[in-house]
Amino acid sequence: MRVQSISRPYIRPHSNGPHVFDRARYHEGTVRELRLPRRQVYVHTAHYVGWLAERNKFSRNYASPFLFKLLRMRLVTPIKVYAHFGGCLVDDMLTMEARAFSMSYFDFEQGHYLKDYCALSRSSPDNILRTRFTWQLYGTMLRLIDERFRRWGGSIRTRGRALAA
Protein backbone atom coordinates (compact mmCIF):
# COMPACT_ATOMS: atom_id res chain seq x y z
CA MET A 1 0.00 0.00 0.00
CA ARG A 2 1.41 3.38 -1.01
CA VAL A 3 1.49 6.01 1.70
CA GLN A 4 -0.17 9.29 0.75
CA SER A 5 2.39 12.01 1.39
CA ILE A 6 0.46 15.02 0.14
CA SER A 7 -2.69 16.09 1.92
CA ARG A 8 -5.86 16.11 -0.10
CA PRO A 9 -8.10 19.18 -0.27
CA TYR A 10 -11.39 19.06 1.59
CA ILE A 11 -14.42 18.51 -0.61
CA ARG A 12 -17.79 18.32 1.14
CA PRO A 13 -19.28 14.92 0.25
CA HIS A 14 -22.72 16.35 -0.45
CA SER A 15 -24.18 19.80 -0.84
CA ASN A 16 -27.23 19.51 1.42
CA GLY A 17 -25.74 20.55 4.73
CA PRO A 18 -22.75 19.73 6.88
CA HIS A 19 -21.18 16.29 7.04
CA VAL A 20 -21.75 14.60 10.40
CA PHE A 21 -18.82 12.39 11.38
CA ASP A 22 -20.48 11.02 14.50
CA ARG A 23 -23.13 11.81 17.12
CA ALA A 24 -23.16 10.28 20.56
CA ARG A 25 -26.92 9.85 20.36
CA TYR A 26 -26.47 7.36 17.49
CA HIS A 27 -25.12 4.94 20.11
CA GLU A 28 -27.60 5.55 22.95
CA GLY A 29 -29.85 2.60 22.12
CA THR A 30 -26.98 0.13 22.06
CA VAL A 31 -25.50 1.51 25.28
CA ARG A 32 -28.92 1.17 26.95
CA GLU A 33 -29.33 -2.41 25.67
CA LEU A 34 -25.90 -3.34 26.98
CA ARG A 35 -26.70 -1.64 30.31
CA LEU A 36 -23.57 0.46 30.14
CA PRO A 37 -23.10 3.89 31.73
CA ARG A 38 -24.41 6.64 29.46
CA ARG A 39 -20.94 8.19 29.12
CA GLN A 40 -19.95 5.19 26.96
CA VAL A 41 -21.75 6.78 23.99
CA TYR A 42 -18.92 9.35 23.94
CA VAL A 43 -15.78 7.32 24.55
CA HIS A 44 -14.70 6.03 21.12
CA THR A 45 -15.15 9.40 19.36
CA ALA A 46 -13.92 11.44 22.33
CA HIS A 47 -10.37 10.22 21.72
CA TYR A 48 -10.46 11.81 18.27
CA VAL A 49 -12.21 14.97 19.51
CA GLY A 50 -9.51 15.28 22.16
CA TRP A 51 -6.81 15.00 19.51
CA LEU A 52 -8.52 17.71 17.45
CA ALA A 53 -8.70 19.96 20.52
CA GLU A 54 -5.11 19.39 21.63
CA ARG A 55 -3.78 19.95 18.11
CA ASN A 56 -5.78 23.16 17.48
CA LYS A 57 -7.87 21.66 14.69
CA PHE A 58 -11.20 23.23 15.65
CA SER A 59 -12.30 26.30 13.69
CA ARG A 60 -12.39 29.64 15.49
CA ASN A 61 -16.15 29.44 15.89
CA TYR A 62 -15.84 26.22 17.87
CA ALA A 63 -12.48 26.56 19.58
CA SER A 64 -12.86 26.60 23.33
CA PRO A 65 -9.39 27.67 24.55
CA PHE A 66 -10.06 27.37 28.27
CA LEU A 67 -11.63 23.92 27.99
CA PHE A 68 -8.87 22.78 25.63
CA LYS A 69 -6.25 24.03 28.11
CA LEU A 70 -7.93 22.05 30.88
CA LEU A 71 -7.76 18.99 28.62
CA ARG A 72 -4.05 19.52 27.96
CA MET A 73 -3.53 19.77 31.73
CA ARG A 74 -5.56 16.53 32.15
CA LEU A 75 -8.09 18.30 34.38
CA VAL A 76 -10.97 17.29 32.10
CA THR A 77 -11.29 14.26 29.84
CA PRO A 78 -11.92 14.38 26.10
CA ILE A 79 -15.36 13.00 26.97
CA LYS A 80 -16.12 16.35 28.62
CA VAL A 81 -14.92 18.19 25.49
CA TYR A 82 -17.08 16.02 23.21
CA ALA A 83 -20.06 16.50 25.55
CA HIS A 84 -19.41 20.28 25.43
CA PHE A 85 -20.13 20.04 21.68
CA GLY A 86 -23.37 18.20 22.36
CA GLY A 87 -21.80 14.86 21.51
CA CYS A 88 -21.65 15.86 17.88
CA LEU A 89 -18.70 16.06 15.48
CA VAL A 90 -19.52 17.91 12.26
CA ASP A 91 -17.23 19.12 9.47
CA ASP A 92 -18.15 22.79 10.04
CA MET A 93 -16.51 22.60 13.47
CA LEU A 94 -13.07 21.90 12.03
CA THR A 95 -10.32 23.73 10.18
CA MET A 96 -10.15 22.94 6.46
CA GLU A 97 -7.08 20.78 7.01
CA ALA A 98 -8.79 18.86 9.81
CA ARG A 99 -11.91 18.38 7.67
CA ALA A 100 -9.89 16.86 4.85
CA PHE A 101 -7.94 14.59 7.20
CA SER A 102 -11.10 13.54 9.03
CA MET A 103 -12.84 12.62 5.77
CA SER A 104 -9.95 10.28 5.07
CA TYR A 105 -9.00 8.94 8.51
CA PHE A 106 -12.12 9.22 10.66
CA ASP A 107 -14.56 7.76 8.13
CA PHE A 108 -16.02 4.75 9.97
CA GLU A 109 -16.41 2.70 6.79
CA GLN A 110 -13.20 3.44 4.85
CA GLY A 111 -10.84 5.16 7.29
CA HIS A 112 -8.32 3.75 9.75
CA TYR A 113 -9.56 5.37 12.96
CA LEU A 114 -11.80 2.54 14.18
CA LYS A 115 -9.22 -0.07 13.19
CA ASP A 116 -6.57 1.83 15.15
CA TYR A 117 -8.90 2.31 18.11
CA CYS A 118 -9.88 -1.36 18.19
CA ALA A 119 -6.26 -2.51 17.91
CA LEU A 120 -5.05 -0.26 20.73
CA SER A 121 -8.04 -0.84 23.00
CA ARG A 122 -8.04 -4.58 22.26
CA SER A 123 -11.69 -4.51 21.35
CA SER A 124 -13.67 -5.48 18.28
CA PRO A 125 -15.91 -3.14 16.28
CA ASP A 126 -18.87 -4.90 17.92
CA ASN A 127 -17.51 -4.17 21.40
CA ILE A 128 -16.10 -0.64 21.16
CA LEU A 129 -18.88 0.81 23.29
CA ARG A 130 -17.67 -1.35 26.19
CA THR A 131 -14.17 0.18 26.15
CA ARG A 132 -13.65 2.40 29.18
CA PHE A 133 -11.76 5.67 28.93
CA THR A 134 -8.24 5.66 30.32
CA TRP A 135 -5.56 8.34 30.07
CA GLN A 136 -3.12 5.66 28.94
CA LEU A 137 -5.25 4.67 25.94
CA TYR A 138 -5.87 8.34 25.18
CA GLY A 139 -2.13 9.10 25.16
CA THR A 140 -1.44 6.14 22.90
CA MET A 141 -4.22 7.21 20.53
CA LEU A 142 -2.83 10.78 20.40
CA ARG A 143 0.57 9.49 19.31
CA LEU A 144 -0.92 7.18 16.70
CA ILE A 145 -3.22 9.86 15.26
CA ASP A 146 -0.23 12.24 15.14
CA GLU A 147 1.65 9.65 13.08
CA ARG A 148 -1.32 9.05 10.76
CA PHE A 149 -1.71 12.81 10.34
CA ARG A 150 1.98 13.29 9.49
CA ARG A 151 1.85 10.46 6.94
CA TRP A 152 -1.24 12.04 5.44
CA GLY A 153 0.76 15.24 5.00
CA GLY A 154 -0.52 17.45 7.80
CA SER A 155 1.43 19.62 10.20
CA ILE A 156 0.89 19.72 13.93
CA ARG A 157 1.10 22.94 15.92
CA THR A 158 2.15 22.75 19.52
CA ARG A 159 2.61 25.94 21.50
CA GLY A 160 2.69 28.11 18.40
CA ARG A 161 5.25 26.03 16.48
CA ALA A 162 4.54 23.77 13.55
CA LEU A 163 6.13 20.33 13.58
CA ALA A 164 7.24 19.13 10.17
CA ALA A 165 5.06 16.57 8.46
PLM regions: where:
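Amphipathic protein-protein interaction modules
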Residues: 71-141
